[in-house]
Amino acid sequence: MSFDPTGYTLAHEHLHIDLSGFKNNVDCRLDQYAFICQEMNDLMTRGVRNVIEMTNRYMGRNAQFMLDVMRETGINVVACTGYYQDAFFPEHVVTRSVQELAQEMVDEIEQGIDGTELKAGIIAEIGTSEGKITPLEEKVFIAAALAHNQTGRPISTHTSFSTMGLEQLALLQAHGVDLSRVTVGHCDLKDNLDNILKMIDLGAYVQFDTIGKNSYYPDEKRIAMLHALRDRGLLNCVMLSMDITRRSHLKANGGYGYDYLLTTFIPQLRQSGFSQADVDVMLRETPSQFFQ
């Protein structure tokens, strides 16, 4: 796994993902290599050196695509291993044991993904449904805990609309995971400050990683929650990203692009009173501590 701690890190992104079959929408097939390489080049000029790629098994992950993007642009892509959430699980999540699922993750961390030299650097994005953890999701979380305990690689989760984060942490902790090795995803999709503070108090990291998705939750409210965390001295527990998943998100297709975080959101954050040092904590220092 290549990781440059001197640069910025986008903590939760997708470079190649295909949920078009599940959603019956070709826009959900993100696979346009030339457009994505151009955007990675743009990110490099803005100081980004690492992209944490959250596409796991059966989400349309493409290891060779990631390797090619790295070679062409010079950006580091940290790949993941795991299973997403119940609605997207393949049949064998039902039939295989927890130990077998864990071993699959371990193999992708230690040996490589799909016969390539690319090894998973993180167990992710393991998810739960909105307002509940299904039995199969619990099974995957336990498998992820086993794989983490064997390899030491960190865990990054998916919460549906900022629900079940505390329950995710309780489940992982019950199976021996040190919560300082867990980051909870999608904490920025509702008024969620109380739960965020509880998760941080337990030792976990939190992600504001749907920045720019104003139709779900406006960026000005994200900024207000970040101010509340800054006032409490907790920015060292926060990481940022955008969760690009669609063709229409790309700039070449009229979208805001991967650099919206840097070109639009960060200037808004600075204008609201954040210092450059505050920004650097969330985009460089904290990810460098967590992901290496």
Located regions from the model:
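Structural preference for beta-strand elements that scaffold enzyme active sites
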Residues: 8-10, 49-50, 76-78, 120-122, ...
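Histidine/acidic-residue-rich catalytic or RNA/ligand-binding cores of hydrolases
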Residues: 19-23, 63, 89, 165-170, ...
